[in-house]
Amino acid sequence: MNDLKSLKSELTSKTVEELFKHLNLLKKELFNLRFQQTLGELKNTSRFSLVKKSIARIKTELTKRSSSGE
């Protein structure tokens, strides 16, 4: 629970540019995970859900900011 709160506070403290950079990094990581899975090299499949949830959290924060006008 504390991890989630610290993650939320970390996201709210970042600028929009930093959020977009982090989002792009996570998208690249997700692509690499899919590539590794196709090749049969992926050991930790739970990383998929963690990366996808992080992407969703960042997108939610960006949407929240765009609707509030920041």
UniProtKB/Swiss-Prot annotation:
Which keywords appear in this protein's UniProt record, sorted alphabetically? Ribonucleoprotein, Ribosomal protein
Family matches, as SUPFAM superfamilies:
Ribosomal protein L29 (L29p)
Q: Which GO terms describe its molecular function?
A: structural constituent of ribosome
Ribonucleoprotein in keyword set: yes
Which GO BP terms sit in this record?
translation
Q: Which GO terms describe its cellular component?
A: cytosolic large ribosomal subunit
Q: Which Pfam families match?
A: Ribosomal_L29
The family note in this entry says: Belongs to the universal ribosomal protein uL29 family.
Protein name as catalogued: Large ribosomal subunit protein uL29
Natural source organism: Rickettsia bellii (strain OSU 85-389)
Q: What is the lineage of its organism?
A: Bacteria, Pseudomonadati, Pseudomonadota, Alphaproteobacteria, Rickettsiales
